[in-house]
């Protein structure tokens, strides 16, 4: 009897070791095998360019800001492509709108000139529209598609000069200019907010590529649909990353449904959760999480918010819990502490822990800012949650707590400076790496004490950052939106190992497997490896 128990123990340990090694040799989900941005067995090159250490580079269909996931010899991506098919009546509605606009122009009162308004619109100021294209041409000096602090200040100065010239000559025109300037950051016209509801159909696909050559293996269409709302100008309709265990690929297209594919691209089941209503039509972006046979899906929105646990085998809901949260874009993280497997989720009102097997709320801890995007990272002791929209906050929360942990000894340490808006943190070698806002300003802290190791270090050549940092073999990779990629030494001191440049705009987080670094750009997918 004892021999059988010992034999079973050794078999269990062997299978655990094999499974752990297998997962470590893949990048199965958004933030890697341990959901912390680290590739345990990775070692891609530190130096590369368009002409150096590019194993392959391929054109991508449609759009998507989701991260590639890699399993064995396959790379999987999601894409949303316009089909060219318009919604019924959309062209007629456009024609009617044009006729109405022409009629209004003809009825303009005599003596009321449109010359000033036209000039203002051409300059990107005033009127009822905000000419973002012209604004970016004039003020986005580094060409990263985003305005940094200096560029925004230059834009504000230009606004003041424009308004000063108009003031006193035509108060009503000036008032329209002020309203028009503010509306540029709203949601109705795209601008800095969300976009209009599209009138064109999209094709939502899962695509498999050969890892060594970049050749397309297969393409599976999940659905075609006209999305019910718009999205942020830098976002898109394929922003949630897939997740795989080597048996199935789980894909969330949000309001277009949750899908379970086999490894050949065949849909085994799909589930509809209705239409999500996001703040300012910013769009959807939370990725599904997979733990054994349970899928965890976050559904934080402006209407009723929920978190779901779904059976991977059949798509049936295991449990569903209401969340007192508005729109959020973080991805749930699953961890086991002292035998209890729990789901950790960031939120503007609280960080929460749910027991995986039944959805029971174990603990919560408030303090985060609004619009939470960064996902939580965990080690054996703490969960590290942060946010950086209209404020800054990071908290190291001890695992194993119970109830409301706000302001208790269960919060190991906090900080309120330099935290990210979009990029998630990197947790590596007892250090947590993160960026300030969406900018190339780096901070690093010791996870045990919260002590600042690197504070507000500006990364030369990088201004805007959406991608989350990753690390492998003692190297940290930080990808800028303008195609600049800086490689740092994974240490407590700031040391640049290499500065690289690619001819692409990057919003997606990188993936690392073995000696390969995968970078999804606006138009291309790169595989970086030593030649």
Task: Give the location of each predicted region.
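Noncatalytic, solvent-exposed loop/strand surfaces
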Residues: 23-150, 154-531
């Amino acid at each position: 009897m004892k021999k059988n128990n010992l034999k079973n123990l050794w078999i269990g340990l062997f299978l655990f070791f094999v499974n752990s090694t297998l997962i470590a040799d893949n990048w199965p989900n958004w933030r890697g095998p341990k959901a912390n941005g680290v590739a345990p067995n990775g070692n891609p090159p530190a130096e590369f360019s368009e002409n150096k250490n590019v194993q392959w580079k391929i054109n991508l269909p449609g759009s998507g800001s989701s991260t590639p996931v890699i399993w064995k010899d396959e790379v999987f991506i999601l894409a949303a492509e316009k089909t060219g098919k318009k919604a019924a009546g959309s062209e007629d509605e456009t024609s009617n709108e044009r006729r109405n606009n022409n009629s209004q122009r003809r009825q303009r009162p005599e003596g009321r000139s449109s010359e000033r308004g036209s000039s203002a619109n051409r300059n990107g100021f005033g009127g009822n529209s905000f000419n973002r294209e012209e604004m970016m041409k004039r003020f986005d000096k580094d060409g990263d598609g985003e305005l940094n602090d200096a560029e925004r200040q230059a834009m504000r100065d230009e606004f003041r000069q424009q308004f000063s010239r108009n003031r006193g000559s035509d108060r009503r025109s000036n008032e329209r200019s002020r309203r028009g300037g503010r509306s540029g950051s709203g949601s109705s016209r795209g601008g800095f907010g969300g976009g209009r509801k599209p009138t064109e159909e999209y094709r939502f696909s899962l695509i498999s590529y050969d890892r060594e050559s970049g050749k397309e293996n297969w393409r599976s269409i999940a659905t075609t649909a006209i999305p019910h709302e718009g999205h942020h100008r830098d976002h898109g309709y394929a922003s949630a990353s897939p997740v795989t265990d080597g048996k199935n690929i789980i894909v969330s297209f949000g309001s277009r449904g949750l899908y379970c594919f086999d490894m050949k691209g065949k849909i085994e089941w799909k589930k509809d959760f209705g239409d999500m209503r996001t703040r300012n039509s910013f769009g959807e972006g939370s990725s599904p999480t997979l733990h054994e046979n349970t899928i965890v899906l976050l559904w934080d929105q402006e209407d009723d918010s929920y978190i779901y646990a779904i059976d991977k085998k059949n798509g049936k809901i295991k449990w569903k819990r209401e969340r007192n949260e508005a729109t959020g874009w973080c991805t749930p993280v699953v961890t086991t502490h002292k035998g209890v497997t729990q789901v950790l989720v960031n939120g503007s009102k609280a960080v929460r822990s749910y027991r995986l097997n039944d959805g029971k709320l174990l603990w919560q801890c408030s303090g985060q800012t609004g619009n939470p995007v960064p996902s939580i990272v965990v080690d054996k002791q703490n969960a590290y949650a942060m946010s950086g929209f209209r404020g800054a906050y990071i908290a190291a929360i001890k695992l194993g707590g119970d109830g409301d942990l706000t302001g208790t000894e269960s919060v190991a340490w906090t900080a309120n400076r330099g935290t990210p808006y979009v990029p998630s943190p990197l947790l590596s070698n007892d250090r947590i790496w993160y960026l300030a806002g969406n900018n190339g300003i780096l901070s690093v802290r010791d996870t045990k004490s919260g002590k600042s190791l690197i504070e507000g270090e500006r990364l030369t050549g990088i201004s805007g950052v959406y991608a989350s940092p990753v690390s492998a073999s003692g190297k940290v990779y930080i990808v800028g939106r303008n195609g600049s990629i800086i490689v740092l030494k994974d240490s407590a001191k700031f040391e640049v190992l290499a500065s690289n440049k690619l001819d692409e705009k990057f919003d997606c987080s990188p993936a690392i497997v073995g000696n390969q670094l995968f970078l999804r750009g606006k138009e291309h997918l790169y595989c970086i490896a030593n030649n």
